[in-house]
Protein backbone atom coordinates (compact mmCIF):
# COMPACT_ATOMS: atom_id res chain seq x y z
CA UNK A 1 0.00 0.00 0.00
CA UNK A 2 2.77 2.43 0.90
CA UNK A 3 4.53 2.26 -2.45
CA UNK A 4 1.18 2.77 -4.18
CA UNK A 5 0.76 6.04 -2.26
CA UNK A 6 4.30 7.07 -3.22
CA UNK A 7 3.53 6.35 -6.87
CA UNK A 8 0.25 8.29 -6.80
CA UNK A 9 1.97 11.29 -5.20
CA UNK A 10 4.83 11.12 -7.73
CA UNK A 11 2.37 10.98 -10.64
CA UNK A 12 0.68 14.22 -9.58
CA UNK A 13 1.50 17.18 -11.76
CA UNK A 14 1.97 20.78 -10.71
CA UNK A 15 4.30 23.05 -8.80
CA UNK A 16 2.80 22.64 -5.35
CA UNK A 17 1.14 19.23 -5.13
CA UNK A 18 -1.11 18.85 -2.09
CA UNK A 19 -2.17 15.62 -0.43
CA UNK A 20 -4.35 14.68 2.54
CA UNK A 21 -3.87 11.82 5.00
CA UNK A 22 -7.01 11.04 7.00
CA UNK A 23 -5.85 8.26 9.26
CA UNK A 24 -4.60 7.51 12.77
CA UNK A 25 -1.41 6.35 11.00
CA UNK A 26 -0.65 9.73 9.43
CA UNK A 27 3.03 9.43 10.29
CA UNK A 28 3.42 6.29 8.16
CA UNK A 29 1.05 7.38 5.38
CA UNK A 30 2.62 10.84 5.31
CA UNK A 31 6.13 9.44 4.89
CA UNK A 32 5.01 7.44 1.85
CA UNK A 33 3.29 10.50 0.39
CA UNK A 34 6.35 12.68 1.02
CA UNK A 35 8.56 10.12 -0.71
CA UNK A 36 6.66 10.72 -3.96
CA UNK A 37 6.24 14.49 -3.67
CA UNK A 38 8.56 17.16 -5.02
CA UNK A 39 10.31 19.48 -2.56
CA UNK A 40 7.33 21.83 -2.61
CA UNK A 41 4.65 19.16 -2.00
CA UNK A 42 2.44 19.42 1.07
CA UNK A 43 0.79 16.80 3.26
CA UNK A 44 -2.28 17.75 5.31
CA UNK A 45 -2.97 15.36 8.20
CA UNK A 46 -6.52 15.20 9.55
CA UNK A 47 -7.10 13.31 12.78
CA UNK A 48 -8.97 14.32 15.94
CA UNK A 49 -6.40 12.56 18.17
CA UNK A 50 -3.70 15.05 19.17
CA UNK A 51 -1.41 12.21 20.23
CA UNK A 52 -1.40 10.76 16.70
CA UNK A 53 -0.58 14.17 15.26
CA UNK A 54 2.22 14.75 17.78
CA UNK A 55 3.75 11.43 16.76
CA UNK A 56 3.47 12.40 13.08
CA UNK A 57 5.12 15.78 13.73
CA UNK A 58 8.14 14.18 15.37
CA UNK A 59 8.32 11.48 12.68
CA UNK A 60 8.33 14.06 9.87
CA UNK A 61 10.85 16.24 11.70
CA UNK A 62 13.15 13.23 12.27
CA UNK A 63 12.85 12.34 8.57
CA UNK A 64 13.97 15.87 7.62
CA UNK A 65 10.69 17.32 6.34
CA UNK A 66 10.28 20.97 7.34
CA UNK A 67 7.13 22.07 9.21
CA UNK A 68 6.21 24.30 6.25
CA UNK A 69 5.40 21.17 4.21
CA UNK A 70 2.92 19.73 6.71
CA UNK A 71 -0.43 20.98 7.92
CA UNK A 72 -2.15 19.38 10.91
CA UNK A 73 -5.89 19.69 11.40
CA UNK A 74 -6.88 18.18 14.77
CA UNK A 75 -10.54 17.70 13.92
CA UNK A 76 -13.01 15.11 12.79
CA UNK A 77 -12.60 14.84 9.01
CA UNK A 78 -16.24 15.61 8.20
CA UNK A 79 -16.11 18.72 10.40
CA UNK A 80 -13.12 20.29 8.65
CA UNK A 81 -13.07 19.06 5.05
CA UNK A 82 -15.87 21.34 3.87
CA UNK A 83 -13.56 24.29 4.62
CA UNK A 84 -10.74 23.05 2.38
CA UNK A 85 -10.16 24.32 -1.16
CA UNK A 86 -12.01 22.52 -3.92
CA UNK A 87 -10.07 20.80 -6.72
CA UNK A 88 -6.80 21.44 -4.85
CA UNK A 89 -5.67 17.99 -3.69
CA UNK A 90 -3.94 15.33 -5.77
CA UNK A 91 -4.13 12.41 -3.36
CA UNK A 92 -6.57 11.96 -0.49
CA UNK A 93 -6.01 8.84 1.61
CA UNK A 94 -9.03 8.23 3.84
CA UNK A 95 -8.87 5.45 6.42
CA UNK A 96 -12.12 6.13 8.26
CA UNK A 97 -14.80 4.04 9.97
CA UNK A 98 -16.95 2.30 7.38
CA UNK A 99 -20.09 4.03 8.63
CA UNK A 100 -18.49 7.39 7.72
CA UNK A 101 -17.45 6.34 4.20
CA UNK A 102 -20.51 7.56 2.23
CA UNK A 103 -20.41 11.04 3.78
CA UNK A 104 -16.63 11.24 3.54
CA UNK A 105 -16.62 10.39 -0.17
CA UNK A 106 -19.26 13.03 -0.88
CA UNK A 107 -17.20 15.60 1.05
CA UNK A 108 -13.79 14.58 -0.33
CA UNK A 109 -14.65 14.21 -4.01
CA UNK A 110 -15.00 17.97 -4.71
CA UNK A 111 -11.55 18.51 -3.14
CA UNK A 112 -9.80 16.21 -5.64
CA UNK A 113 -7.99 17.97 -8.48
CA UNK A 114 -8.41 16.71 -12.02
CA UNK A 115 -6.16 13.65 -12.33
CA UNK A 116 -6.09 13.27 -8.54
CA UNK A 117 -7.03 10.11 -6.67
CA UNK A 118 -9.18 9.30 -3.66
CA UNK A 119 -7.75 6.24 -1.88
CA UNK A 120 -10.15 4.24 0.31
CA UNK A 121 -8.38 1.37 2.08
CA UNK A 122 -10.34 -1.61 3.43
CA UNK A 123 -13.55 -0.23 1.91
CA UNK A 124 -14.77 -3.48 0.35
CA UNK A 125 -14.94 -5.53 3.58
CA UNK A 126 -13.32 -8.61 2.03
CA UNK A 127 -16.02 -8.61 -0.68
CA UNK A 128 -18.88 -9.03 1.80
CA UNK A 129 -20.57 -6.04 0.16
CA UNK A 130 -21.44 -8.35 -2.73
CA UNK A 131 -23.37 -10.68 -0.43
CA UNK A 132 -27.03 -9.55 -0.53
CA UNK A 133 -27.79 -11.46 2.67
CA UNK A 134 -25.50 -9.07 4.60
CA UNK A 135 -27.72 -6.26 5.84
CA UNK A 136 -25.83 -5.01 8.90
CA UNK A 137 -25.13 -1.26 9.10
CA UNK A 138 -21.43 -1.55 8.31
CA UNK A 139 -21.95 -3.67 5.20
CA UNK A 140 -24.79 -1.44 4.00
CA UNK A 141 -22.59 1.66 4.45
CA UNK A 142 -19.70 0.03 2.56
CA UNK A 143 -22.07 -1.04 -0.21
CA UNK A 144 -23.52 2.48 -0.43
CA UNK A 145 -20.02 3.98 -0.59
CA UNK A 146 -18.95 1.59 -3.36
CA UNK A 147 -22.12 2.25 -5.36
CA UNK A 148 -21.71 6.01 -4.98
CA UNK A 149 -18.09 5.97 -6.15
CA UNK A 150 -18.98 3.80 -9.15
CA UNK A 151 -21.81 6.22 -10.04
CA UNK A 152 -19.48 9.23 -10.31
CA UNK A 153 -19.43 10.20 -13.98
CA UNK A 154 -16.13 12.04 -13.66
CA UNK A 155 -14.25 9.13 -12.07
CA UNK A 156 -12.17 6.18 -13.15
CA UNK A 157 -12.68 3.60 -10.40
CA UNK A 158 -10.40 0.67 -9.62
CA UNK A 159 -10.87 -1.93 -6.92
CA UNK A 160 -7.80 -3.80 -5.73
CA UNK A 161 -7.44 -6.82 -3.44
CA UNK A 162 -5.20 -5.02 -0.95
CA UNK A 163 -6.13 -5.27 2.72
CA UNK A 164 -9.83 -6.03 2.85
CA UNK A 165 -10.37 -4.31 -0.49
CA UNK A 166 -9.07 -0.97 -1.77
CA UNK A 167 -11.01 1.53 -3.87
CA UNK A 168 -9.14 4.05 -6.02
CA UNK A 169 -11.21 6.80 -7.64
CA UNK A 170 -9.31 9.06 -10.03
CA UNK A 171 -10.97 12.25 -11.24
CA UNK A 172 -11.15 12.66 -15.02
Region roles according to the model:
Residues 2-172:
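S-adenosylmethionine/decaboxylated-SAM
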Amino acid sequence: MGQLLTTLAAAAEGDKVQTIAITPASSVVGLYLFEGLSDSGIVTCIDPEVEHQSHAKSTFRDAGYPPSRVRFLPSRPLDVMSRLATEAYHVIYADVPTLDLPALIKTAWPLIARGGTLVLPDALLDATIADPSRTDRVTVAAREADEYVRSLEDAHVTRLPLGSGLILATKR
